[in-house]
Design a protein with these regions (language model features):
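Conserved N-proximal alpha/beta basic substrate-recognition cap immediately N-terminal to
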Residues: 1-41, 48
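ATP-grasp fold ATP-binding core
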Residues: 27, 37, 50-69, 86-97, ...
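Short amphipathic alpha-helix with an adjacent loop that forms part of the alpha/beta core around
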Residues: 46-52, 79-84
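Glycine-rich phosphate/pyrophosphate-binding beta-alpha loops
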Residues: 66, 120-125, 130-131, 174-187
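Phosphate-binding site of ATP-dependent enzymes
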Residues: 73-142, 161-169
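Gly/Ser/Thr-rich active-site loops/lids in small-molecule metabolic enzymes
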Residues: 136, 179-197
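Conserved metal-phosphate-binding beta-hairpin within the catalytic cores
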Residues: 150-183
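Peripheral (often C-terminal) accessory segments that flank ATP-dependent C-N-forming ligase machineries
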Residues: 192-255
Length: 255
């Protein structure tokens, strides 16, 4: 027997939500609106959707940091991928709107911490390197539905899209910590809520957060290509360094 209970679901549940097709099926069974998502396990599966490629997003069923994502590619771009049962892909309907990310911690299906945010700058198409908090009641209800429906224990995160009419659709799930954790800076309150008997803890950081070194490496070149230096300068001026913790200079020095 393990000396301590892992603060996470069983491996089967973790695999289910991390798989980009299985997660959408789970959300659908929980009564949530979801984007049409097709599992691709063969060249025949790929050919069946090739004609609609301009309306779809293609990504490996097992992936993170937006690796290998093809966003509304031309049909010939699909020649670069070869889905199989051991390396499946998904074809998901492209959803226009505002992307929202969610980081949550739950115990026995009840939310104990939740941070909602949007990425202002990214490392290429992947992880956010500058992000700001947002509030959205529909997104909170979606997260509550999933953690309650799964009896979730531990950390769980989501990439979602809010459409123009306010409807929020889940795109994928990451059963781990993500950048939203940086919006909690009071260790005592966080630990009391997550591991003790304290009430749900709200984020105590309201300013945008950034990884300054990554902003110079990824954000500046992207701003130059897009002709958007003004937004880059504003982010560098207003956002706080996520690694800058009072009394602990080591993370910033390591960067």
């Amino acid at each position: 027997a393990m000396p301590a209970r892992p603060f996470a679901p069983g491996i089967e549940r973790l695999a289910q939500v991390h798989n980009k097709h299985a997660f959408i099926r789970l959300a659908d069974r929980l009564g949530l609106a979801v984007p049409e998502t097709t599992l691709l396990q063969s060249c025949a599966d790929l050919e069946a959707v090739r004609g609609q490629s301009r309306e779809l997003v293609f990504k490996p069923a097992w992936s993170r940091f937006a690796s290998h994502v093809l966003l509304r590619p031309s049909p010939d771009f699909l020649d670069a991928i070869s889905p199989s049962p051991s390396a499946p892909w998904v074809a998901q309907r492209f959803v226009a709107g505002e992307e929202i990310s969610a980081y949550a911690v739950a115990r026995d299906g009840k939310l104990k911490a939740l941070a909602l945010y949007r990425s202002i700058h990214r490392a290429d198409k992947g992880a956010g390197i500058c992000f700001e908090p947002v509030e959205d009641a529909a997104t909170r209800r979606l997260v509550e539905r999933i953690v309650a429906g799964t009896g979730w224990n531990g950390q769980i995160s989501f990439d979602l899209m809010r459409e123009a009419d306010g409807k929020v659709l889940p795109l994928e799930c990451n059963p781990r910590a993500v950048s939203g954790l940086h919006f909690f800076r009071d260790p005592a309150r966080f630990v009391d809520a997550v591991l003790g008997d304290g009430p749900e803890v709200a984020p105590d950081v309201t300013a945008p957060q950034m990884v300054r070194l990554a902003m110079w490496i990824y954000g500046l070149p992207a701003a130059l290509r897009a002709g958007d230096l003004g937004r880059f300068r504003m982010a560098m001026r207003e956002a706080q360094e996520v690694l800058d913790w009072p009394g602990d200079p080591a993370p910033v020095k390591a960067q």
